[in-house]
């Protein structure tokens, strides 16, 4: 057994070089007095190291800045860093206040933001040629997710899917064919092949029975209201069949758990919330107005929203969004 530069810090996400002689990994400092359900906007900066697999000798090649992005923020992926065929490391980083992808050379030079903008990356995978990176994000469609592609040489990512659906978990085969899981407001998730023009072909068309009531499911409205401290809160509003704005209806407010979650304008990528979306549709079918609230401390809207001041055990500031949701419904 060869230990890679052992220390008192936490070493995670190892990935081999293409020549199998080196290993890159993330090193996160140990910090005391870190409690759950409290905002953590900065900490001791994390870093990326590369070790010689024979000797175990390692070298730090990159380190996060102090302040914004100093606390490691993960993405949904098999591994948190990717070693590409052109000898770059691609990794998630919140330097700009959003979960983005960056690249550096394995020498530690030429840090580059691959996904610029006010949005967040979530599901990430690498192509089998070890060059291209596929990912889902809410760029230009903040309450949905679509699929994009980038690599260490691109200035801006290419958008591969769009529309009123939600796409995630991209994966490519050795021939470059791209596959995803996808849903919409009236179809639950199932697998698709992504065509070159961005359209989707179902790989399991019989997975959803003909009896599924897709024609009566409602397209939720995107609602944004302002809560305390001028924080914008995104919501999905489900209205009853044949809704009449001159009539009164019973109303329900849905709050997700977590709280690191973002409810979407379609069936969700997590099983529990996939079912919760269906439940909200059912309640609307029973004559209720349903408001699903993405309260502060959730994901999708940047680090400052996720690490909301005084949230959770440090003051429950997110409860102000509960009050604001009730006031919104009362004002309709």
Regions found by a protein language model. Name each.
Residues 130, 159-162, 166-332:
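Serine-hydrolase catalytic core recognition
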Residues 65-69, 109-112, 155-158, 207-210:
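Sequence/structural signature of beta-propeller blade repeats across diverse families
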Residues 74-87:
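Signature of short aromatic-glycine-proline-rich micro-motifs recurring in repeat-based ectodomains
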Residues 20-23, 88-90, 132-133, 178-179:
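Hydrophobic beta-strand positions that form the internal "hydrophobic ladder"
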Residues 1, 5-12, 26-53, 60-76, ...:
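A flexible loop/linker signature enriched in serine peptidases of the S9 family
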Residues 16, 82-84, 126, 172:
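Residue-level recognition of a conserved intra-blade site in WD40 beta-propeller repeats
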Residues 53-56, 105-109, 151-155, 195-198:
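Short loop/turn segments that connect beta-strands within beta-propeller blades
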């Amino acid at each position: 057994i060869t230990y890679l530069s052992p220390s008192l810090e936490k070493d995670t996400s190892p990935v081999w070089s293409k020549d199998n002689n080196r290993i890159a990994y993330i090193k996160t400092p140990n910090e005391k007095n870190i409690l759950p359900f409290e905002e953590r906007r900065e900490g001791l900066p994390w870093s990326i190291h590369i070790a010689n697999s024979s000797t175990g000798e390692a070298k730090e090649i990159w380190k996060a800045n102090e302040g914004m992005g100093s606390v490691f923020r993960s993405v949904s992926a098999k591994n948190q860093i990717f070693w590409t065929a052109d000898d770059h490391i691609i990794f998630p980083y919140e330097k700009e206040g959003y979960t983005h992808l960056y690249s550096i050379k394995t020498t530690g030079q030429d840090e580059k933001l691959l996904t610029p903008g006010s949005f967040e990356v979530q599901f990430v995978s690498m192509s089998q040629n070890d060059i291209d990176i596929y990912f889902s994000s809410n760029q230009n469609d903040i309450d949905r997710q679509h699929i994009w592609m980038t690599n260490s040489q691109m200035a801006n990512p290419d958008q591969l899917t769009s529309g009123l659906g939600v796409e995630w978990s991209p994966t490519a085969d050795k021939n470059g064919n791209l596959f995803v899981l996808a849903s919409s407001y009236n179809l639950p998730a199932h697998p698709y092949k992504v065509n070159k023009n961005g359209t989707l072909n179902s790989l399991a068309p019989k997975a959803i029975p003909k009896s599924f009531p897709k024609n009566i499911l409602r397209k939720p409205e995107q609602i944004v209201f302002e809560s305390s401290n001028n924080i914008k809160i995104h919501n999905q509003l489900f209205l009853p069949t044949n809704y009449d704005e001159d009539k009164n209806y019973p109303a329900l407010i849905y709050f997700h758990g977590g709280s690191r979650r973002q409810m979407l304008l379609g069936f969700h990528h997590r099983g529990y919330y996939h079912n919760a979306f269906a439940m909200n549709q059912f309640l609307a079918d029973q004559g209720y107005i349903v408001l699903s609230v993405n309260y502060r401390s959730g994901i999708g809207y940047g680090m400052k929203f996720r690490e909301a001041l005084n949230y959770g055990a440090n003051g429950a500031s997110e409860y102000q969004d509960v009050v604001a949701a009730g006031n919104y419904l009362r004002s309709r």
